[in-house]
């Protein structure tokens, strides 16, 4: 059997795992300490830094899931969402509106780190497996892979096709 290379990118909560597999074995694996949690933290830090607004993890995750996007929309600021938190200047509750473009700016660093991890793994791929990856592309999975346009960002950065495999979390009924 001839070795066939496959690249898997699993963007989880705490880390992004990048692996190159062949014949059921891991040929190369790399872990980037960036995942959905770091994206949430970046949103929290952005809100604090640019709006003097303290928000919690649940609010950051809601922002990420509702209007999170891996890069700025081309033609406008995109969809808007209301965000509530505590004003860090006077300590009272405050509501502001933020846009997709602002969220993309907020999460640009963790997105870049994920892209860099994928590119580094591609550079380490054995040549014969790299040819397979060029042909088959990259398979993405994990909750972070659901971030809107992360596939487009990775496609543009690598020149490779991407496919998404979403494995839903088990429900109480499934257990």
Sequence positions of predicted segments:
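Glycine-rich phosphate-binding loops at beta-strand->alpha-helix junctions
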Residues: 130-154
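Phosphate-binding glycine-rich/basic clefts of nucleotide- and phosphate-handling proteins
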Residues: 23-108, 112, 133
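Conserved phosphate-binding catalytic cores of ATP/NTP-utilizing and phosphoryl-transfer enzymes
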Residues: 1-9
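Single conserved hydrophobic/aromatic residue that forms the stacking wall/gate
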Residues: 165-175
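Phosphate/pyrophosphate-binding loops at sites that engage ATP/ADP/AMP, CoA/4′-phosphopantetheine
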Residues: 52, 119-136
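Catalytic phosphate/nucleotide-handling subdomain of diverse soluble enzymes
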Residues: 150-164
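Structured core elements
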Residues: 7-8, 15-20, 54, 80-82, ...
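A short acidic Gly-Thr/Ser loop motif
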Residues: 8-15, 21-25, 35-37, 43, ...
């Amino acid at each position: 059997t001839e070795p066939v290379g496959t690249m898997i990118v699993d963007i989880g909560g705490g880390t992004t795992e990048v692996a190159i597999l062949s014949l059921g074995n891991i040929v190369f694996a790399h872990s980037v300490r960036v995942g959905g949690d770091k994206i949430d933290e970046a949103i929290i830090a952005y809100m604090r830094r640019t709006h003097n607004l303290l928000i919690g993890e649940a609010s950051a995750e809601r922002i990420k899931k509702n209007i999170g996007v891996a890069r700025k929309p081309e033609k406008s600021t995109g969809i808007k969402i209301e965000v509530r938190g505590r004003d860090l200047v006077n300590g009272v509750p405050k509501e502001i509106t933020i846009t997709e473009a602002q969220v993309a700016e907020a999460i640009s660093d963790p997105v870049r780190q994920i892209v860099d991890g994928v590119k580094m793994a591609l550079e380490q791929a054995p040549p014969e497996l790299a040819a397979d990856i060029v042909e088959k592309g990259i398979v993405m999975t994990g909750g972070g892979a659901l971030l809107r346009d992360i596939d487009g960002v990775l496609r543009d950065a690598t020149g490779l096709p991407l496919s998404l495999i979403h494995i839903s979390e088990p429900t109480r009924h499934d257990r």
